[in-house]
């Protein structure tokens, strides 16, 4: 510990021990505890206490009957655990009876402070810290702490209850590390005392008729098998598995969700051989005993396992598919035909679960669709995969929700009434349908997919979120449409669908709901980016009003829509698909180009989102050599940087630096790698003098923009500028000739201006800079040091331990105002 901190520590301990003093907030106490943890991890806790006796006095003061702050008491309990984690310091604290009086029945356990959850939490965390050596185990057994931990598992505070369960797992693991001659015996008498007590309590809880106690026991076991993988865990499972299996004989099965978590934790544990401990049989029995809602997560977990018997995988997949099989069975006209894999025809239990209420029906279907969506991309997904049946089920669900299905059975009509207009199922089914686009399907089913998507996009009843997901699913299915080898154009079926879709998109772009307009523009941007160069798509799009509407939406009252319109316009313009109508200001026929429109938005829009979108478009245009840019690249870059430098949004300024970097790379050129198989080496163009190469950068005032950004008040902008200038300096250093390196122009005026900028006075511009001056300034600047300073947190000075102690003392007036840092 620093001498300065040692001098401040006695005063701070006196403040903490005095209940009359105003107490520092929890953040200060947490930082103080972290500091002590750092000290004890690096050195001796015993030496720390001996050199700073005020710490022991503080802990002893907690034992006096007084009106202590619960926060300070909790802090002291945790601090004691930090010190006692080292065995020699533990023995030192034991000699003074400090540990039994703090953590035993004579301590906070019997006082009024125990009613505060923060004290109970501090007690648990203190024990968690000190339980690291054999002496701690004997202490826990002797002071009765384990029994208290058992009771805290049912604490009213969820944080305390969870911490108690985790502490039991930690103590159990520490106890079982004792035997060095192999795993412990199955005989109860051979288990260490603490471990035996915990396992006995778990056994008693599993035999209990009270569901909360069963849940607590299952949660402890789940954490144990999830974190402990030593051989003794197999012994533990063999001992307790009959009691776990016995839970399946109860009706209903208690704590089903916790039981599922435990079984999956055991199945994933590398310390267990599932085939030799009866786990597969227990999993199969559990699948058959749980309700469909409870069994879904278990079935998904089983199917995610790498090594699992095929029969169990088939059973789990059948359980997962049952709700969708019921949907198909209830709506199909062919009796008994669900189309799913064997064993999923839709048993009576699942039908009863689906139909009683809308909440049960919707919840089960949404969970089933989510589970299948997670399973689809996995390499261990079941094979064969019933792609056609799942497509049919997803389409049927969407039709039921839309009211376009015509079920003939009573169950089907009931299901239709439950799902009609259900947005939750619509969203889940559209997500699942989009994921299914990764596979193939019969042509007639694909036609149904496009039909139901078009139905949703057309329907006035579709909510904005449903429409967004319908657009997303539509794009994914268009991407997956069959293609002719060597041709990326849309196939005839997709093209026919597109011609029906564009009028719908036109209508959605005119929607009074801004979320719908925004989703339509995002969809248009995706479509144009993918098929903008294809003749069939171009012809269909230009024959519609979509480009004109997109241009009009650049002036939408909602900023999110304007931003999406900017992105769509950028994509349309890149593909030559923009239609520029006469502007309202020039009715005689003068037209505005997309570049002029977006520059106007960058200069005048009152919201940040459209301006950011414009900067992204400009950067992409420069990178792709857009037609409007290559005509006069320097004028384009200079104009954009001039506007961006004055923008109040730091993201716009940062994107301006990205554009500057692209221009810099294009101007100086990136060294390319010659083809190793070329017959003759490529002809290298003679390199231009460095000063000549930098002239375009000077003409667009790129350096003034970068230097100004270097002292930006927003750190991300300054960091990006620093990286750009470091890149430029490295680039020029490798390209400059010895003669250029020896040139030493007068840079005093530029450096003086930069110093004023750094001080906050950026009113005076740098003016025209010559390349030689720029190179000299770059060589003289400590950019590496600046980058290091920018990488530090804004409060790195005030985060020191000395500053923390001063601030805590200043809150009670012990230090003068000028002696404390503010952070």
Swiss-Prot record:
Modification comment: Ubiquitinated by NEDD4, NEDD4L and ITCH; mono- and polyubiquitinated forms are detected.
Location in or out of the cell: Nucleus; Cytoplasm
Residues in HEAT repeats: 495-531, 544-576
Gene Ontology terms, MF aspect: ribonuclease inhibitor activity
Modification Phosphoserine, positions: 744
Residues the record lists as binding Zn(2+): 822
Motif (BRAT1-like motif): 821-823
Origin: domain of life: Eukaryota
Region (Required for interaction with NDFIP1): 100-200
Function: Component of a multiprotein complex required for the assembly of the RNA endonuclease module of the integrator complex. Associates with INTS9 and INTS11 in the cytoplasm and blocks the active site of INTS11 to inhibit the endonuclease activity of INTS11 before formation of the full integrator complex. Following dissociation of WDR73 of the complex, BRAT1 facilitates the nuclear import of the INTS9-INTS11 heterodimer. In the nucleus, INTS4 is integrated to the INTS9-INTS11 heterodimer and BRAT1 is released from the mature RNA endonuclease module by inositol hexakisphosphate (InsP6).
Record's subunit section: Part of the multiprotein complex composed of BRAT1, WDR73, as well as integrator complex subunits INTS9 and INTS11. Interacts with BRCA1 and ATM. Interacts with MTOR and RPTOR. Interacts with NDFIP1. Interacts with SMC1A and PRKDC.
Family: Belongs to the BRAT1 family.
Written domain comment of the UniProt record: The BRAT1-like motif mediates inhibition of the endonuclease activity of INTS11 by forming hyrogen bond and hydrophobic interactions with the active site of INTS11: Cys-822 coordinates one of the two active site zinc ions of INTS11.
Protein name: Integrator complex assembly factor BRAT1
């Amino acid at each position: 510990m620093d001498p300065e901190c040692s001098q401040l520590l006695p005063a701070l301990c006196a403040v903490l021990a005095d209940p009359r003093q105003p107490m520092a907030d929890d953040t200060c106490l947490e930082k103080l505890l972290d500091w002590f943890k750092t000290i004890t991890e690096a050195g001796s806790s015993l030496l720390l206490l001996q050199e700073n006796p005020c710490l022991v006095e503080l802990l002893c003061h907690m034992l006096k009957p007084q009106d202590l702050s619960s926060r300070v008491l909790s802090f002291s309990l945790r601090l004691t655990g930090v010190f006692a984690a080292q065995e020699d310091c533990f023995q030192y604290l034991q000699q003074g009876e400090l540990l039994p009086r703090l953590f035993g029945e004579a301590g906070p356990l019997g006082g009024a402070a125990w009613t505060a959850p923060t004290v109970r939490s501090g007690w648990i965390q203190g024990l968690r810290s000190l339980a690291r050596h054999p002496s701690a185990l004997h202490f826990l057994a002797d002071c009765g702490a384990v029994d208290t931990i058992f009771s805290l598992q049912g604490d009213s505070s969820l944080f305390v209850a969870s911490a108690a369960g985790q502490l039991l797992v930690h103590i159990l693991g520490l106890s079982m590390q004792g035997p060095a001659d192999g795993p412990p015996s199955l005989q109860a008498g051979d288990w260490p005392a603490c471990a035996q007590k915990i396992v006995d309590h778990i056994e008693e809880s599993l035999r209990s008729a009270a569901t909360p106690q069963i849940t607590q026991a299952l949660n402890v076991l789940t954490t144990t098998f999830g974190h402990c993988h030593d051989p003794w865990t197999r012994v533990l499972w063999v001992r307790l598995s009959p009691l776990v299996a016995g839970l399946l004989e109860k009706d209903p099965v208690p704590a089903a969700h916790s039981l599922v978590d435990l079984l999956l934790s055991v199945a994933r544990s590398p310390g267990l051989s599932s085939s030799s401990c009866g786990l597969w049989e227990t999993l199969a029995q559990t699948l058959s005993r749980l309700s469909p809602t409870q069994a879904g997560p278990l079935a998904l977990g089983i199917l995610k396992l790498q090594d699992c018997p095929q029969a169990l995988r088939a059973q789990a997949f059948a359980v997962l598919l049952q709700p969708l099989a019921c949907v198909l069975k209830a709506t199909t006209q062919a009796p008994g035909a669900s189309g799913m894999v064997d064993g999923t025809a839709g048993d009576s239990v699942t039908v009863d679960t689906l139909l009683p209420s809308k909440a049960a029906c919707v919840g089960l279907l949404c969970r089933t669709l989510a589970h299948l969506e997670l399973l689809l991309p996995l390499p261990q997904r079941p094979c064969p995969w019933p792609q056609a049946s799942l497509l049919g089920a997803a389409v049927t669900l969407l039709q039921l929700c839309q009211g376009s299905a015509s079920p003939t059975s009573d169950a089907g009509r009931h299901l239709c009434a439950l799902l009609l207009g259900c947005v939750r199922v619509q969203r889940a089914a559209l997500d699942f349908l989009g994921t299914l686009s990764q596979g193939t399907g019969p042509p007639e089913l694909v036609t149904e997919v496009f039909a139901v998507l078009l139905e949703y996009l057309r329907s006035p009843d579709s909510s904005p979120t449903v429409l967004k997901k319908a657009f997303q699913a539509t794009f994914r299915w268009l991407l997956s449409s069959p293609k002719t080898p060597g041709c990326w154009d849309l196939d005839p079926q997709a093209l026919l669908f597109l011609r029906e879709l564009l009028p719908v998109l036109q209508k959605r772009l005119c929607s009074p709901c801004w979320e719908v307009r925004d989703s339509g523009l995002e969809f248009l941007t995706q479509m144009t980016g993918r098929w903008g160069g294809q003749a069939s798509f171009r012809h269909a799009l230009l024959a519609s009003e979509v480009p004109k509407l997109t241009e009009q939406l650049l002036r939408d009252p909602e900023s999110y829509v304007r931003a999406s319109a900017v992105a769509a316009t950028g994509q349309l313009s890149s593909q030559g698909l923009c239609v520029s109508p006469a502007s309202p200001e020039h009715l005689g026929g003068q037209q505005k180009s997309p570049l002029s429109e977006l520059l106007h938005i960058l200069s005048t829009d009152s919201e940040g989102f459209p301006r950011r979108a414009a900067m992204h478009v400009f950067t992409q245009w420069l990178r792709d050599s857009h037609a409007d840019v290559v005509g006069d690249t320097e004028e384009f870059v200079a104009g954009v940087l001039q506007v961006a430098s004055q923008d109040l949004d730091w993201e716009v300024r940062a994107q301006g630096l990205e554009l500057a970097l692209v221009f810099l790379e294009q101007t100086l050129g990136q060294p390319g790698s010659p083809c190793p198989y070329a017959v003759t080496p490529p002809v290298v163009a003679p390199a231009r003098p460095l000063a000549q190469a930098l002239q375009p950068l000077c003409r667009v005032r790129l350096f003034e923009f970068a230097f100004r950004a270097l002292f930006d008040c927003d750190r991300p902008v300054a960091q990006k500028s620093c990286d750009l200038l470091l890149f430029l300096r490295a680039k020029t250093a490798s390209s400059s000739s010895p003669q250029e390196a020896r040139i030493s122009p007068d840079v005093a005026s530029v450096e003086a201006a930069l110093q004023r900028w750094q001080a906050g006075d950026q009113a005076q511009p740098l003016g025209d800079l010559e390349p030689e001056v720029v190179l000299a300034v770059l060589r003289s600047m400590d950019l590496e040091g600046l980058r290091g300073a920018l990488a530090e947190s804004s409060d790195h000075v005030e985060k020191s331990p000395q500053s923390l102690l001063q601030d805590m003392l200043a809150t009670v007036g012990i230090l003068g105002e000028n002696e404390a840092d503010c952070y």
